[in-house]
Amino acid sequence: MSGIMRVPSILAKNAVASMQRAAAVGVQRSYHITHGRQQASAANPDKISKQYPVVDHAYDAIVVGAGGAGLRAAFGLVAEGFRTAVITKLFPTRSHTIAAQGGINAALGNMEEDDWKWHMYDTVKGSDWLGDQDAIHYMTREAPKAVIELENYGMPFSRTQDGKIYQRAFGGQSLKFGKGGQAHRCCAVADRTGHSLLHTLYGQSLSYDCNYFVEYFALDLIFEDGECRGVLALNLEDGTLHRFRAKNTVIATGGYGRAFFSCTSAHTCTGDGTAMVARQGLPSQDLEFVQFHPTGIYGAGCLITEGCRGEGGYLINGNGERFMERYAPVAKDLASRDVVSRSMTIEIMEGRGAGPEKDHVYLQLHHLPPKQLAERLPGISETAMIFAGVDVTREPIPVLPTVHYNMGGVPTNYRGQVITIDKDGKDVIVPGLYAAGEAASSSVHGANRLGANSLLDLVVFGRACAKTIAELNKPGAPAPTLKENAGEASVANLDKLRHANGQITTADLRLKMQKTMQHHAAVFRDGPILQDGVNKMKEIYKQFKDIKVVDRSLIWNSDLVETLELQNLLANAQMTIVSAEARKESRGAHAREDFKVREDEYDFSKPLDGQQKKPMDQHWRKHTLSWVCNDNGDITLDYRNVIDTTLDNEVSTVPPAIRSY
């Protein structure tokens, strides 16, 4: 550590001054740079760093991320009496949850008879039978309660004429186990449901004594003796380091859409949580399953909600034809997202695309009444005008499949506990570590997520993390002890990147990664392209050692932050493309031209009774686990079984079958 440059004295003085301000406002809510009343102490442990100011904190629980899942976990913990720190790299209401448009699924039955068991069936089918049915059982059963809870918090749902929560049609949703036609299950706030949900949860969190650490960048988890004991974070405002100790840590950092060139994700969606977990030698799960949303605005990538099709919009090709009935005769434009994205891509590949280059299709809305567009899709009308120059009451929107969601993430059980496997392949709980939302893989989405199940995932499993922690721990218990040098490796990495003086800039290397992933891990994949992508990504990963950071400061250093984020993105991208190349089948969002069939342990086109089950190494209905092994980006893969059992006898397992819409 002797080569680390010493922080200027003015920075140390600023850090002390900020702590004095924190003490002065200790009677107020702990917020922003406030260090949490009596839980913080000034420190500069020689064993970590003699150069960087360090502040130690002790809490009952830590939540990393303040989107929907993080906020729901945080105030759920505080409600149970746990002193909770919320660490977030941006203000809570800027979290990407705000970008969700269409709605949140729950079998309320406001539009017609509905049942959560039908919702469960649709979710298992939508996952292409890769989803864990105990977790899907839990989520869909809890869904009606979760939505009513949101309503009680004040979430301003759109209403029917008789005052009930309005529910629209959404892709892959059916009645009577797929035999009763289209379901209207998606509870909506016009086309701004995520915005409303995030503000509702944030407002609710302010009713509780959550300790917010806003614009703090989580650098790494702190592990000792095989258990998670805290988090090391960088205060972006003054450059101080903060070491948080707690018996329980919840990862709620969202996805990593920014590993791709065209995506609907905010620039902050950089997979920080999955990368932090990977650096502790723990696996990520099913990262090869990346959802392409059918309707991103052509050329911009901005999301156009599936709710447009739920309200009666439909897709047309360059010849003006409605083409989805060729691919999904029953559901048509409301087939599952992977089906619609592939259908659009086929239309374009076969020369029926729209525009001068015939490289996109159209979403038509102008046949809908202007009043319906104004009331149910006001945000889309605005977005289409800004980003495509289109008046939706007069002309169609040019659209193209765009990276939207990561089905994979940190593997967890349905209680939110992070899991790994032992040498016998059995699930093992990682003590002290939880995950929820897009950062997690519980796995309720399997190989493909149904639209409007993501917001449901956030609130159900954010709450589940809080409940599990409350069941297993008592508030006010002593925080775990740490070794004097806990976090030392993370500080060394920070300092190394801060003073990196290589040949390639962060922006240039990030662009190379994004274009490689976009081309080599797209809607359709095949062996040679995937293998080429694996080779290219390995070289890009190695080039990170030659990164150049221009800004050496510690105060609002966006160059340094983007470099830390790129380090996280590279880990996620590498695991994604290696896992995709290894999976020799087509399932859900993973569609291979050279392996077009789904490979289950049984022949799912026939009755399962009497069939011999294939060994695990002869089929692909299994979860991929991926580990980052070293600084060169080498990836190790293993697999774990899909959970087919439900939580109890109130609902039966959904057996694998042909998936058609």
From Swiss-Prot:
- Record's GO cellular component terms: mitochondrial inner membrane; mitochondrion; respiratory chain complex II (succinate dehydrogenase)
According to its UniProt record, which residues of this chain constitute the active site?
Answer: 337
Tell me the PROSITE patterns matching this sequence.
Answer: FRD_SDH_FAD_BINDING
What phenotype has been reported when the gene encoding this protein is knocked out?
Answer: Disruption of mitochondrial function has no effect on the initial stages of photoreceptor development (R cells develop normally, adopt the correct cell fates, innervate the appropriate synaptic partners, and assemble synapses normally). However, beginning around the time of eclosion, R cells degenerate, progressively losing expression of synaptic markers and undergoing extensive morphological changes. Synapse loss is caused by reactive oxygen species (ROS) production, not energy depletion, as photoreceptor ATP levels are normal.
Q: Which sequence positions carry the modification called Tele-8alpha-FAD histidine?
A: 96
Molecular function GO terms recorded: electron transfer activity; flavin adenine dinucleotide binding; succinate dehydrogenase (quinone) activity
Q: How does it assemble?
A: Component of complex II composed of four subunits: a flavoprotein (FP), an iron-sulfur protein (IP), and a cytochrome b composed of a large and a small subunit.
Q: Which family does it belong to?
A: Belongs to the FAD-dependent oxidoreductase 2 family. FRD/SDH subfamily.
User: What is the official name of this protein in its record?
Assistant: Succinate dehydrogenase [ubiquinone] flavoprotein subunit, mitochondrial
Q: Which organism is this protein's natural source?
A: Drosophila melanogaster
